[in-house]
Swiss-Prot record:
Keywords: Amino-acid biosynthesis, Aromatic amino acid biosynthesis, Isomerase, Tryptophan biosynthesis. This is N-(5'-phosphoribosyl)anthranilate isomerase. The keyword Amino-acid biosynthesis applies. It comes from Candida albicans (strain SC5314 / ATCC MYA-2876). Gene3D superfamilies: Aldolase class I. Its EC number is 5.3.1.24. The gene is TRP1. It is an enzyme of class 5 (isomerase). It comes from the Eukaryota. InterPro entries: Aldolase_TIM, PRAI_dom, RibuloseP-bd_barrel, TrpF_fam.
Length: 226
């Protein structure tokens, strides 16, 4: 089974659909002044919903560096759902303050910030790497990322814009990761080194989360196998 992340959630209703249908990760945009930026009070409500829908997860035990991301993905599948807050080039102190206030499980870094500065906290880490420009950086940082509960994300430059990646680069990926970038329920690729799928616009209709598309994406994502 692959990890499925529904991102850009702004409402309790969309979160409820994602949780009830087995999404492993729910993503909320906490970058100011974006179309999908969530109200902090709504984010707190969703954090409570996520925690109510799971047992207290066991501490991630870690493992070999070569299998680390695979083990993190399996831990997420077995113990989720988890709430992810998406940040972009925001001060580290602000990121951690908001993460603690909301009650996040994971921090997703979507800008040019130094990902390694965010290691060693109580939060899991989902660092975004631009394909193909930052694949060398991912290879360089992958060993350091195994120091925490982390899962790399491959995406386009900004993300959330529905732009498909050039999947020929995925086949040559030096490590395992989750995939974003223009995904829909109809176009999920299967690669040995892809551990999951991240979607936002691909489950929307006219800019609003579409329950039927969310359900279909989760079903299709979980049905994919390496």
């Amino acid at each position: 089974m692959k990890v499925v992340k529904i991102c850009g959630i702004k409402t309790v209703e969309a979160a409820s659909v994602a949780i009830d249908n087995g999404a492993n990760l729910l993503g909320c945009i906490l970058v100011p002044n974006r179309a999908r930026t969530i109200d902090l009070e709504v984010a707190k409500q969703i954090a409570r919903m996520v925690k109510r829908d799971r047992n207290p997860p066991p501490k991630f035990a870690g493992g070999t560096s070569t299998q680390h991301f695979e083990q993190v993905a399996q831990w997420i599948i077995e113990n989720g759902p988890f709430l992810v807050g998406v940040f972009r080039n925001q001060p580290k102190e602000e990121v951690f303050r908001i993460a603690r206030e909301v009650g996040l499980d994971f921090i997703q870094l979507h800008g040019s910030e130094d990902k390694l500065e965010f290691l060693g906290t109580e939060f899991g880490l989902i660092p975004r790497y631009v394909v193909p420009d930052e694949l060398d950086l991912l290879e360089e940082q992958s060993l350091s990322l195994t120091q925490c509960v982390s899962l790399p994300l491959l995406d386009s430059e900004v993300g959330g814009e529905g732009k498909l990646l050039d999947w020929t680069f995925i086949e040559k990926l030096p490590t395992k990761a989750i995939l974003a970038g223009g995904l829909t329920p109809e176009n999920l690729p299967t690669f040995d080194n892809i551990l999951g799928y991240d979607v936002s616009g691909g489950v929307e209709t006219n800019g609003v989360k579409d329950s039927l598309k969310i359900i279909k994406f989760i079903q299709k994502g979980h049905a994919q196998s390496s």
